[in-house]
Amino acid sequence: MGDMLAELGKKLAERWLSLLVLPGALYLAVSAAAVALGHDRPFDLPRLTSRITSWADSPAVGSAGGRVVLSAAVLAGAAAVGLAAQALGSLTEQLHLAADWPAWPPGLRHLAHRVTGRRRARWEDAARTWHRHRDEAAAARARGARTAALPRQSARAAMTRVSPEHPERPTWSGDRVHAVTVRLERDYHLDLAALWPHLWLTLPDHVRTEISAARQALTRATTLTAWALLYLPLAAWWWPATGITVVLVLTGRRRTRAAADTYATLLEAAVRLHARDVADRLGLGSDPLSRESGDALTRHLTPSTPPRPPRDSTLTDASDPPAAPVRPSPPVPPVPPVPPQGARRS
């Protein structure tokens, strides 16, 4: 038990050091360089060395206690910056995936709506071109001929660059993850939101490890974009920070798209390979996955809706029996009825 706790503490310390302290310490170093160099002499290494030497010769850090305090302050500052980057990373991840963009603030929601509309128009144009090439290829095969594959492949690539499915979100990464839900519903009538918690509990350990690693890679990629937001204010003191910001944004965007694609691919593969295991454990049979079995599995896993709330007691109906006479009491304003949230309509 002691060895296990020691190993766990070692791994936690390594993660704390690699995810928070080291990136935060690099940010503090760049910040110090930005303050020391400024805009006029951004790459003057002798000036930077001189400023650092003067700071090191300060009486406040000359003693052993001062150095300890300085080291603790640097570690705390680096960890604080790392935590800020993690928090910003959560926000940038929400922006990249845009799963709840209709609930965003009005201005941001309006922008997301316009971007989604433009992406839909581009995708539909590319999809029409791709389907035209497919129809031409099918007609040629019916005549015993063949058409060139390159135009058809190029048209499909152009469509996929916009979105793998009909765009429903303002970002490519969001549509890539959402495409898993669309495809499973279209191919097997599966509701991924209802199926996934049950499927996760039945997946083999190595599959869950791969999916968790892909999810963490997506989080790290979006956090890289968050670091770009932290480096951007340094451009007010040191203009090369603008270049650092641009590099981080481009790298973060590329990694986010790649990580989202990998994560979505693993999600879809896990469902297609192991959804039958869930059906078998629930006693629904182990037949090959089909639309019929997917319908049955979705119905079995979808929770029932809340019952219809009782009728407001303040309302009367002609069929109700007359109430027994009671002693009059001071009037009380009626409580308005609660609207049924998600109640099934008949």
Feature locations, PLM:
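Transmembrane alpha-helical segments and their cytosolic interface motifs
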Residues: G9-G24, D187-G243
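Cytosolic/matrix-facing juxtamembrane and C-terminal tails of multi-pass cellular membrane proteins
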Residues: M1-W16, R47, H206, E210-A217, ...
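Pore-lining and gate-forming transmembrane alpha-helices of multi-pass membrane transport proteins
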Residues: L70, V74, P233-W237, A241-R257, ...
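Juxtamembrane "helix exit" motif at the C-terminal ends of alpha-helical transmembrane segments
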Residues: L28-R47, Q86, L224-L250
